[in-house]
């Protein structure tokens, strides 16, 4: 508990940084070309970074499961001149969740640690993030994830089947009206999933498709931003769609964007005016009383579809690590009764304004 309190205190200090201190972080700059494999690794000079992995898989009985694994890195700018190895120069957090459509249950867990001592780290030359017995690592063919949560375990492999999808303008993704409100951002859609999930001692072999996001920034959100709605969809025809909107304090759209990659590889970058999220149905959490628009109509460029959740209750309580509540859930996309694809919907800032 003392370690957790120290971590949350460090995050709080980071949130109180003024604009001048923000300039002490590395900044997102136009014209920078992402370099792989280097940019698969961590970028510790930036304030915030995450590796976000979600997917739909089926077990041996044909049941649908939703998987989510996210690792976060934060540079709080606290005690950076302190020579002690215990100084919290870099903080790491992780969330994992398992949604079971058959039982309607959601299991989730979280981790938090200061980087160091070989127990928590995010390597810079490749994707290799570790907190104790939770890890996400790059392999020769893709990625491997190992999670030993309190109620479930993941031993999953993710094979790359498509090229990296650079979001925004060649990997620079605007997140607000000011140019500096941006991130470096790429995705890897249509990852082929294999491996096992263990729940209550029962090990199940699973297979399916996943989506990986890697994003880093030092000034992600405008001060008037409340949160965001985001989707990442593996389309049934082999294409991929990412779309988001940043909401202001009144619920309006402060900024929006996305990318649609066709099955033939052509990419269309979506401008703010081409993306629209319209709530169709809301769900209220019985635990927190927070209300989320779990079913949505989405317009992304020239396509329009409805999102329906695998199940309504996919709220994640991460107040013990990253200090917030959010809805992160498996969804299907349909248009005219036809399934267009499967993916994940993220809804933040519905409990309180999101602070990164």
Language-model-derived ranges and their functions:
Residues 6-18:
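Bacterial N-terminal signal peptides
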Residues 23-356:
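Structured soluble/peripheral alpha/beta segments that form catalytic or ligand/cofactor-binding pockets
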Residues 1-4:
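Positively charged n-region of N-terminal signal peptides that target proteins for export
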